[in-house]
Every structure is written in C-alpha cells, then in structure tokens.
Swiss-Prot record:
Lineage, highest ranks first: Bacteria, Bacillati, Bacillota, Bacilli, Lactobacillales
EC class of the enzyme, as a word: hydrolase
Family: Belongs to the peptidase S8 family.
Any one Gene Ontology cellular component term annotated for this protein: membrane
Residue ranges of Sequence repeats: 1034-1050, 1051-1067, 1068-1084, 1085-1101, 1102-1118
This protein's name: C5a peptidase
A GO molecular-function annotation: serine-type endopeptidase activity
Organism of derivation: Streptococcus pyogenes serotype M1
Gene: scpA
Region span, 5 X 17 AA tandem repeats: 1034-1118
Biased composition (Basic and acidic residues): 1029-1054, 1061-1071, 1078-1088, 1095-1107
Amino acid sequence: MRKKQKLPFDKLAIALMSTSILLNAQSDIKANTVTEDTPATEQAVETPQPTAVSEEAPSSKETKTPQTPDDAEETIADDANDLAPQAPAKTADTPATSKATIRDLNDPSQVKTLQEKAGKGAGTVVAVIDAGFDKNHEAWRLTDKTKARYQSKEDLEKAKKEHGITYGEWVNDKVAYYHDYSKDGKTAVDQEHGTHVSGILSGNAPSETKEPYRLEGAMPEAQLLLMRVEIVNGLADYARNYAQAIIDAVNLGAKVINMSFGNAALAYANLPDETKKAFDYAKSKGVSIVTSAGNDSSFGGKTRLPLADHPDYGVVGTPAAADSTLTVASYSPDKQLTETATVKTADQQDKEMPVLSTNRFEPNKAYDYAYANRGMKEDDFKDVKGKIALIERGDIDFKDKIANAKKAGAVGVLIYDNQDKGFPIELPNVDQMPAAFISRKDGLLLKENPQKTITFNATPKVLPTASGTKLSRFSSWGLTADGNIKPDIAAPGQDILSSVANNKYAKLSGTSMSAPLVAGIMGLLQKQYETQYPDMTPSERLDLAKKVLMSSATALYDEDEKAYFSPRQQGAGAVDAKKASAATMYVTDKDNTSSKVHLNNVSDKFEVTVTVHNKSDKPQELYYQATVQTDKVDGKLFALAPKALYETSWQKITIPANSSKQVTIPIDVSQFSKDLLAPMKNGYFLEGFVRFKQDPTKEELMSIPYIGFRGDFGNLSALEKPIYDSKDGSSYYHEANSDAKDQLDGDGLQFYALKNNFTALTTESNPWTIIKAVKEGVENIEDIESSEITETIFAGTFAKQDDDSHYYIHRHANGKPYAAISPNGDGNRDYVQFQGTFLRNAKNLVAEVLDKEGNVVWTSEVTEQVVKNYNNDLASTLGSTRFEKTRWDGKDKDGKVVANGTYTYRVRYTPISSGAKEQHTDFDVIVDNTTPEVATSATFSTEDRRLTLASKPKTSQPVYRERIAYTYMDEDLPTTEYISPNEDGTFTLPEEAETMEGATVPLKMSDFTYVVEDMAGNITYTPVTKLLEGHSNKPEQDGSDQAPDKKPETKPEQDGSGQAPDKKPETKPEQDGSGQTPDKKPETKPEQDGSGQTPDKKPETKPEKDSSGQTPGKTPQKGQPSRTLEKRSSKRALATKASTKDQLPTTNDKDTNRLHLLKLVMTTFFLGLVAHIFKTKRTED
C-alpha cells in the first residue's frame, strides 16, 4: 500500500540517522550482552564509550512513577589524556618502574597486601570473556616473563592440542591467547569495554606511560586469555558461545574467568544445558567465574521506583544468576582519585575540590569566575564575559547552559550539583568549551566566596567523594528471577580509571568495572591457598575462597537511613582483600552451602541459624548480633533504601580450634507487622546481617547476610492488572490523558509501542477505504492507494468523534470494557491478541477461549518463557510484551467461526519462582458478525447542502461511527475525509476539499459515501448517489463487510480522478528537491548531537490541545469535515504497510526476541521523528 509523505527530507535524514545510531549501538554489544558501564542517559545503551550525561529535571506534574533523586548519576567516562598512537605491546622483559601506581594512592579494597602474598599473579592465567579488545595495548606487559605459565607460543599450542582446540592466536607474552567466539567474521567494533575490564584485572602499564600514575591491575603479572563473544544469532546461541569460551579457558589453565556482561532479568533456569554444564565444569576444576550484577537498577529502571505492592523488583539476570558464579555489585568508596581545583577561601586558606572536566581548563592558571544562577536567562550572564560561569544544575539541559555561557562570552563553565550527595556527572562537549562538574557543597562555597578566582591543578589527587560510601544507583538489585540471593559481594565501580583502545586510559562506571577487581582478588586468594592448603583439591580451594571472601566483606552502612544497605543490593558487602587474606574464620548457613542465608517465606517470628568455622589451631571467642530491617516505602513506591527495625543484643560464642559451631538467633517483628503490611500489602522482605566481632566495641570481623520474605513470595502476582480495571485509565508504565477519564494515548495509535504499555487485548482497525478496495478485487493490500492505514488498537477502545488519534475505553453498565470483535475477514476488529506487562518472570503462557458453559473452544500454542517487563527505556525492553501465539480470530478448534455471543478469553501462566501455582487473567469478549442495516434512500437540500437519511441505522451492537466519507485526489494520492452528523442527524456536505498545499478541489456527489460501523467492527457503506436515487443495495453487491465469494458485477464507482478505486493513478510519485521519491530514504545523514537530532534543530511538535483533544481554534463543527491539516499530515507521514502490531516485543522466538526488540523499537522511533508527533522534550539536567 503506497502512501504519501509530505515531510522535508532533512527531517527524514534526522530520523534515519537517529535509527542508525541506536541500531549501531545495539550491533556493537547487542541487546543486554555487555553490562552498560556508561549509562549516559535514561536509555542506557550498553556501551562503555565516553558519553555526556543529560538529566531530566523533576517534572512539575505529579505522576505514579516519579523520577528518582539521582536517576542519571551512573556515567562517568573521561578520556584521561591524549596519548601516543597505538603501538604493539612489548614482548620483552620490562624492568619494574618507580612510578607510583593508582593503587599506591587509593586502595579501598586493600589489594596490595594480598598481591604481596600471591606474587601479583605471576605464573597464573586469567581469562576475560567480553565484547571486544585492543589486543596490542601498552598495558599488556609482564615484568618478568620467565615466571609466566606459557613461556612461548609453542607452549600454548601444545596445551591447545591436548584439549582439541584448533583455533585462537598467540599475541604476545602477556596476551597468550585471543579468539573471537562470535563466529561472525567481523572485527570487534567495541574495543573499549573488554580492554577496560582487562586492565582492571591484569593491566601493567609501562613507566613510559604519559599518565601521571601507572595502571596496575589486581593481577598485573598474570597472563591473559582474551575471548570475544557477542550476540549474532540470538541469546541461546550467544550463551552456547560463551559456554565454549568457559570450557576453553578452563582447559587452558585459567585460574579465574571474568564475565562483565549480562541479560537483565533472565532466569538461570532458561539457559541452554550446554551453558549450565560449562558452569559446573569450571566449578569442578576449581576455576572461579566472576560476573557483574548488571546496571539495570531495579524494576522500572533508573527513572522509576518500584511499586510497593509488587516486591519482586530484582533484575539481576544471566549469567550472574548462576549460583556457582560470584556476582558483584557496584559501590562508590568515600575517596577517589580525581582532578582537582583550588580556591582561596575567605580566611585565605587553600581549598581543594574534586572536579570532573570535559575539555579541561588550562592547568595552574588562575581564572576569574562569576555566578550565573541556573544559566537560563540572558540576564544570568551579565558578569561572565572573560570569566568562568558558575551555574547551578537544574531546569534546562547541560548543553544549553554551556551554549548560553559561551554566547555570553564566558571562557568556561562550572556546573554544581543540586543534590547534596550526588555522584559526579560528565558534561557534554559543546564546541570544545572547557566545562567541569562539581559538588553542591563546593558550588555553594564558590558562590559565597569573596575571592572569585579558581585554579585547576595539573596532577590528580585522592579526595573525599561528595556521595560518601554509597551503593551505585545503577547497580542491579536481586533477587534473581528464579528467587535466589544475588548479588554476592560489592566492589568499587564508580569512576574507575583503566585502559581503553589505542593506548589510552579512561574512567568508566558500572558493575563491569567492579567484577574484574573481585576476579583478581579471587585469583590471588586461590593462589595463596595453593600454598596455605596444599592438600585441598582445586574445587575445595575455590569453595573456601568464595566463602572467606564473602564472610570477610564489610557490610556497607547507609548513613542517611541509619541502616545497612540491603543484602539484595550489596550482597555480603564491600570486598576486603586484606581481611580475606588474613582470615582464619568464616561463616556460612547452617548446611555449610554458602555464605548467605536464604530463609524463603517467614512469619512474624522466625530464626536465623548460621555456622561459624574456625580454621586456626586455637579456640576463638567472638561476639555476635543480628540487624533486622526491611524496605523503606515512599507513598506507594519502594524508596530503594533500607528501613531499620531493630538489632538483637550482642551474644558471646567460643569456637573450638579447627572446628565449627552453630548459633541460632530468634527474630520477632510482630510489633511492626501492621504498619509494614499497610503499604506493602502483598508482603515484604525481612533481612539483615549477622555480624561478628572479637569485641563488641571493635570493628566488624566478619558477617553473613540473610533474607526472608513475610508472605508468599512464590505466588506473588506475575501480571499487572489489565488497563480496563484501572479507574483512571493508567498503569505503571502508562499515564492516562488528563482530558478524559479512561482515555488512552493522545498521540495516536502508531505510538502504542512506545507509550501504551499495559495489560490489555489488542486488535486491528481497518479503514473502510481499504476494506472496500479489497472487496472490489485488489488482492494485494500493498497495491491499495489510500491516505488511511491499518492500525493496531486495543479491544474495547474507540476513537473520539472527529479525532481518531484519541481513544477511550467504552464500558458496559457493569463497568466491564466493551471488547467486541467481528471475525469476518475484513481486517477490522477480526481478532484479539494478548498484551501484558509482566511484573515477574513466568513460564508456560497459554491463551484459551471458553463459552458461557465453561467449555474450552480454542487453545493457543504455549509460550514457554516470559521475561518481566523490567523497564521501558527503548534500549533494553519495553513496558509490555505482545504474544503472537495468543491471537484468536474468533474460530473454534476446528477452524470454524464461533456463534455470536460472549466468550471468556483466559490467559494462563505460572511464575517461575519455587512453589508457584498457576495464575490466570480473564477478559470478556463479544463475538458478533451481524451487519448493520442502513437507510436505502436520502434527500439532499441544495440550499444548505444538508443530506437527510430516510432512517437511522439498525445494528446488533451499538453504533460506533456513522459518517459521510468523501475521497478526492490530493496530487497523486486518494485522500479521505469524514463528516460527522449534525445534532439533528443530518449531514452537511462540503462543496470542495482542501489539499495539503491549500489548494481547493471541487467535490461531486459521487465522491461521498455513507459509512456505518458498529462496536464489533461490522461496517456497511453505501454511495450517496445510490441513496439519492432511492436504490436498495443487496447484500451480495452492497458495501456490507461480509466478504463476498466473487467480485461485484457492477463497475466500481469512480473517484474525482476518473480512475477506478482499485487502480493506481498513472502519475509518477512526487519527488522532492533531492530527486528522491517521498517513500524512499535519503542516502545521506546529517550530523547529529547526542540526542539524535541535528545540532541546530529541535523536533517539531503538534500544537497544544485543549481538554477535548482538539487543536484550539481548529475544532470542526458537527456535520462539517475535519480540516485539521496537522492531523492529516501526521496520518499520511505515518502511513506504512506494517501494522503497529509489529512494534512491540513478542515471544514468537524466545532466542531472538530480545535481539529483534530494539530494531522494532527503532522502527517506531523512526516513524515518530518523521511525523513530528513524538513529543519528546529535550533531556534536562
């Protein structure tokens, strides 16, 4: 079906470029394959490339899902310097250097002590499985290659041959093995991520580095196995590829394997058997697999808080969900290596402050600065010429603040935070303008400081962070979809400086940065244990190392809430290599399975039993207590913060030498249950830490987290209630329009994929012009020329009169939605299909239809795997999923159309949590194929051009639309407009139509058609000329929507062009100035900024609408044609052969579903930009 596009091609190019940028980002690391280490915007495209952060200002409109306080703090990606061009890493021995390492200055995880005991990993092999690497970075270096496991390429080839490995290359003494397991034959586009991760694990920069401090990883003397894995043929194939990499890494002698990537919310149970076997194989050989927890925060992502009545908000996915892996969360320590600036305070003291720069200021130069409020108005910048503009964060985009300052003559910009304990944010690059971000505390000091000068220092220093010790907002919460405790432990992941491609270094943030540090510590600890416990098997040493590392971790405390961060966020706490190395004791659950306690469902009174192990030759006396806490609730939302309940008293225990002993702590929260159940009606977590000290007044020696759920976790609802059950027409991801109760998306059905994410039944709306053309013999719908398009809508919803971009829910007297279909094959409300917002992962989803006696008349195929709709950010997932297998076209098991009547459409599914029972959701669906009976005659007054019908239509279902349609030629496209009846039931027919360019086209009586549609989608249409002649249309020849077996014998009515409606005009498609036809993409793409728009243009928006949903001043009168050119333009621009049913993720192919998701979403994004209806306001800081 060819439609007309009227927009300029520069706008098309913008849309194409926007689509290309996001699809390229997807192809670099694919859907959720690498945990995003620079989630620069709310879309959080998973790429570690340095990108600017833009933040939205809090909306003035109260919503159900408010912005979190620090919704975009996660990204810092700062090119540390401009280093020499890429050069191959040295393969000769390199003498040790005296230049200080980054760890010499700041070592929050206390790795240096363990490094000394384990020889910095010399003689050890470590593996990194990731999306791409710079194989020849200068940091890939051994200080003494004589201690290496593989002395030569020949040694490696011998090991490969022993295990049947026929692929993989020797790069140099450091990178002993490299292979691309993706098998796509492409060079890795993303070399940043894997290079950065590998540097944290095993980097060893030379003394010649231009960095002020030398990079040294946790195991700098270990050799590297670099294994590239990327999604090519779906998630299942991807999982099999990294499973093979795991097996090869084990066989080539890796002590530890780092996997800093993940698929959010996916369950371990759904991994291929080959992948599960690979995990088991590594464990049996004593090889530690360390994974990142993910950067997806919680259900709702980084911009929404979870609902308090849906406590299963964890999003840790695979491979992190595997129990044998050590899964790592991210936190920010209280001190950080950072750029600094110095000011003189009022008392003439030098004050140093941390800064994060974009386009750095000249070092050691004194700059004058002036306060410029929030940088919005011209008057804000009256004093900034030749100075640095000091601007407070908020209200408008960072880019605009910087651009405004530059326009006013400022030489640079300092933006200070509007939050007291926020994370630093990298500012966008605006015309190479020097800019830096500072804390609120430092910004207020500068604002009030009488001496308005500042100097930027050349050498970075370690300074306290504004946030203090704090879990990263982006770090993914547990539990896993399977209901298991994850993450296991936490490590620094905020602003980590490491190697990136081309011999450069940069700061990145993410759990991908946390994991390799823990991987290095695990490798060093296992190497220490080889000497300390020589009689243990490798698997026993691995088990001990994991338990000791978790036990010796320090539970992190939230100073603001006066409670410990949740174990579902931090695991056992912050890793401490020094404590682990010196530990002679550790603590496990009562079965000695792991160093975490999963209590599952509990009541108000329960017990926590743990086992204390003493591996020393002396008895140990300890004191212990338990903390008891739950989730903090803010209104109807989880605050993602802890709420302390109470602490038990300290108790004393003595553990004999080389022995173990159990302790049991009773917990009673009865006094809190009433207050807790009020906001958390479906249950809540009861959790905390059992902490041990050698003296109650001293620091914590070790601890173990425990988690229980007050309620029935396994049987929590998996599916959000249907939108039909919402009193205000809104849901978690969807906000109803404010101008009408029960009203849905106000921007048109074409954007349901982006906006209307809720649980409902979808169906299809087919305009009568297309139905008419098909019945008149057009076999291929693509050959139909029409200004109207087929659209996916929601069953039970109907367009407002004269405004088919606004839909509302029509209800029976009992409040149930009027969901009706007419399965007659005309494509108009012929079927229903299930769309759901899943709050939890589920399995075995099936739809079935029951008659009024409860007999099953139809059953769908089974969808085996359902993933919770944990976000709605375009980059990873949408807020709902459409299930193709659930489409019911009104037929029974034998393929026959069912009788007219009311049926129950039931969707059944089972949460994947242990002990869960099957759940279901029902919808009432009316089936009715009765064709409306319409008047057979009419009269027409030439004086007032009023058409009066002889009778009102008779329908089995309520009348949905009774209209007069008229079709005219707008250039080469048949264009249809509609006239609604006057209050007295007559229709006023126009004499002429107006084209898009404003020209007039005379209308003949033969251009008008009387069209009636009922609420089940049955349509009857009659030419007005026949009504005036008083002829009655017979069913086999008229315009009823019962599809005839053969073409009408009468010739089709001709339109204004003289062409029959089933024939295409002979004119060629209109071309614009580029020589391209309007339905073809331009070959060139304009340069864009980070928003996907050309830098000097903002997206066009439709005029603001009033409460009726109409453009003010443009509302057509009843009985008059709709003349809103805005609407007509958008309809044409959005005309496409693809129905919007293809814009939501489906579960037709579970292995490729998520891979296809972003491509489908980008199609929608492309359409939206072309139409200029997608009203995205620019991201604000």
